[in-house]
Design a protein with these regions (language model features):
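Noncatalytic, beta-rich nucleic-acid-contacting surfaces in large DNA/RNA-processing enzymes
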Residues: 1-289
Length: 289
């Protein structure tokens, strides 16, 4: 076996696939949460059934109870998810993809659930599964494929745009090629420019669909626990972030659980375990460390 340390862009130039090893904190939290109630972490299929039409879980997003919910806890994102009020996994995945920078010009209409069109009926029909928006890289590839551009060329073009490698003549060549295929399929260039702008923006910053869906699942694993086992959720997460020394997250969790769920902070008491956070369900009291 040969092990080599090679910079990512060099690997790309040789056509190799690189592996990224990431430590994802949310996975550990999810395990702790379900373990705390004696439940094995549900499979994704099981999770889908658990949250399907489950008003309590989806209410967490509507209320803005998003602290520690993956991808939704920044103040600006919380306001946005409260406005959008996702009610199914498909919508939450779309929301997570939609808050990327490349979707900035379209985000307001999306959050307000306004009917959207690309201006071309054929393109809209292609993108029915993502509300007619180019939310994902796959949506752009689907358009390229429909225009008759080979899949390999589609992938390479999106990759180069995303890494800002296409400039000047190279970028113009891509644009001219797209125009040619557009005219062949649609017959005119009336709506080419606005669609092409969205394609460029989307290719630069958009997620692929499985990435957005995986993040939505992570978020929902936590949202379900917060909705159905509220005290356990906060007990586990408060202790998790206390152990990590993340005082800001501890403060945010306490602020949320007291303001939204009506819990209160207790005081140090004899006979209580003061080495960690504990929550008394009967009195809705959080005993501090």
């Amino acid at each position: 076996t040969i092990v080599a340390n090679i910079e990512g862009s060099l690997l790309d130039s040789y056509g190799y696939v690189k592996d990224d090893f990431l430590i994802v904190d949310v996975v550990g939290i999810i395990y702790k949460l379900y373990n705390s109630i004696g439940m094995k972490v549900p499979t994704v299929s099981e999770l889908r059934e658990m949250v399907k039409c489950d008003e309590l879980t989806w209410k967490m997003y509507e209320l803005g109870a998003t602290c520690s919910l993956n991808q939704c806890e920044k103040a600006t994102t919380t306001k946005r998810v409260m406005k959008y009020k996702p009610k199914e996994i498909k919508e939450l995945a779309a929301f997570i993809a939609g808050i990327r920078p490349g979707f900035k010009s379209l985000i307001d209409g999306f959050l307000n659930r306004l009917e959207y069109t690309n201006g071309e009926k054929a393109i809209d029909e292609l993108l029915q599964d993502c509300f007619h928006y180019m939310l994902y890289q796959e949506a752009v590839m689907k358009i390229f494929s429909w225009l008759g551009i080979p899949m390999k060329d589609s992938y390479d073009t999106i990759k180069k745009i995303s890494k800002k490698k296409l400039k000047g003549e190279a970028l113009k060549k891509v644009e001219d090629t797209l125009k040619e295929h557009w005219v062949n399929n649609i017959g005119n260039l009336d709506n080419f420019e606005p669609v092409y702008k969205v394609i460029k923006d989307s290719a630069r910053y958009s997620f692929n669909a499985p990435h957005a869906l995986a993040m939505a699942n992570d978020s929902l694993y936590e949202a379900w626990m917060k909705a159905h086992y509220t005290s356990k959720f906060y007990e586990v997460t408060l202790n998790h972030y206390q152990e990590k020394g993340d005082k800001n997250k501890v403060f945010a969790l306490i602020k949320e659980v007291t303001s939204i769920f009506g819990f209160r902070m207790g005081t140090y008491e004899y006979g209580k375990d003061n080495s960690k956070f504990t929550i008394d369900d009967n009195t809705k009291t959080i005993y501090p460390v």
